Amino acid sequence: MGCNKRGVTRQEDDFSAWYNEVVAKAGLIDRGPAKGTMVIRPYGYRIWELLQDELDSKIKELGHENAYFPMLIPENYFNREAEHVEGFHPELAVVTHAGGKELSEPLVIRPTSETVIGDMMAKWITSHRDLPLRLNQWSNVVRWELRPRMLLRTIEFLWQEGHSAHIEKSDALRETLFALDIYTTLARDMAAIPIVSGEKTAGERFAGALNTYTIEAMMRDGKALQSATTHYLGDNFARAFNIRYTTAEEQQAFVHTTSFGLSTRMIGAIVMVHGDDKGLVLPPQVAPYQVVIVPITTGNKASEVGHAAADLARRLQAAGVRTHVDARPQLTPGWKYNEWELRGVPIRLELGPRDLEAGTTVMVRRIGEKAKQPIAIAAAPTELPGILEEFQRTLLERATQFRDDHTTLVDNWDAFATTVATGWALAIHCGNPECEEDIKAETAATPRCVPRQGAPATGRCIRCDAPSAYDKRVIFARAY
């Protein structure tokens, strides 16, 4: 096993070690004091803010309003919906004592908010005139992970969860697909991740849902990462929490509810989709700094170079480019170059006395064969926005090519087992949860989704030879 000069393990040697080292050394996260928890450092949190700002605006366009609900939920709320409590029980963190006394009823620390929001909906909805009701919450949640992995599966994480209540089933189903489209666009346009969207099989559904939809992304090791989900909950939670309304005909009816969520694991997806042996590679749309200027302040022109770097930064920021000047005097330019490569900054500008005399700066792209070239200082504010757009497109195209190259249509069991070791398999599936358990036991692969855009296909199950439960092939992969 080898490391590069930054002390980062090569991906091909140990992808898991590479990931753990990069998220820490690039300044995204640190480990929290309690096992399985994490601290999101400012650099990582800024990525989350950029995703959050875009997603929040799109969710509001869908008609959702932000609200906040309690983190502590009475335990009996979870017992009202049998499938929900069964699905979440192993992950629940429960408070039994407070104020030096045992509580009369244990309180669950929020793993998700369908229960408490359902209780509030029952108070707020009385008439068909109150519908649809659309709510959104930005919060932390706690799920007691036995095998935590930073940003992907931690005991506590940040997320967005949307909830809605509707008169018609068709409207609720449409809401789940609208939310899925929002997530798809966010992943593609902001994170440069070419996801596949589709419906989960019965065995992979959210606890208490009738339909669960997902966006799945392929990581650089060929594994899948479920990056966001949306759920049609039918009237399950409406019945459990008595969410009724009076119809126009003065009859009582239950609402149809939905929920959908995206978390900080999207940051982990960005790391594993785009990163390389040098460290992070950040899409410009989510990069805290799109450009870092490194002034080379040696000799008698140090002050002049420093002022020129600051002036260039101001003009770039005025052009809408997030820019940082690394003027730390205690570090050499070479050290700074390596650090900002590790931290994934899309473009680095090197500016020294000779560059200043020539009226140019050396532009270094984080990726590409011809990564280094001079650019006129005067032209930088007009040229760099377009160069950043090209960088964003290149990352998306590169990730799309990698996904397509590692997705294989398979029709026999031997080929299936070989394929899921390094990528995704498109296979016929019977839809039986017991068959899915057998597949997982033998290959560690699970059904990721029935793709929305998949071509029609029929046949016999890849594992048990039973008839297909779907009119398409199913994506199987090992997953995080």
Swiss-Prot record:
Q: Which PANTHER family does the annotation name?
A: BIFUNCTIONAL GLUTAMATE_PROLINE--TRNA LIGASE, PROLYL-TRNA SYNTHETASE
Keywords recorded for this protein, A-Z: Aminoacyl-tRNA synthetase, ATP-binding, Cytoplasm, Ligase, Nucleotide-binding, Protein biosynthesis
The EC number of this protein is 6.1.1.15
Family annotation (InterPro entries): aa-tRNA-synt_IIb, aa-tRNA-synth_II, aa-tRNA-synth_II/BPL/LPL, Anticodon-bd, Anticodon-bd_dom_sf, Pro-tRNA-ligase_IIa, Pro-tRNA-ligase_IIa_arc-type, Pro-tRNA_ligase_II_C
A GO biological process held by the record: prolyl-tRNA aminoacylation
Carries keyword ATP-binding? yes
Q: What class of enzyme is it?
A: ligase
Assembly and interaction partners: Homodimer.
Q: How does the entry describe the domains?
A: Consists of three domains: the N-terminal catalytic domain, the anticodon-binding domain and the C-terminal extension.
Q: What does this protein do?
A: Catalyzes the attachment of proline to tRNA(Pro) in a two-step reaction: proline is first activated by ATP to form Pro-AMP and then transferred to the acceptor end of tRNA(Pro).
Q: Which family does it belong to?
A: Belongs to the class-II aminoacyl-tRNA synthetase family. ProS type 3 subfamily.
Q: Does the keyword Nucleotide-binding apply?
A: yes
Primary site of residence: cytoplasm
Can you state which reaction this protein catalyses?
tRNA(Pro) + L-proline + ATP = L-prolyl-tRNA(Pro) + AMP + diphosphate
| Name this protein carries in UniProt | Proline--tRNA ligase
Q: Name one GO molecular function term.
A: ATP binding
Disulfide bonds, paired cysteine numbers: none
Cellular component per GO, a single term: cytoplasm
Q: Specify the superkingdom.
A: Bacteria
The record, for SMART domains, names:
ProRS-C_1
The record's listing under Gene3D superfamilies reads: Anticodon-binding domain, Bira Bifunctional Protein, Domain 2, C-terminal domain of ProRS
Tell where it localizes: Cytoplasm
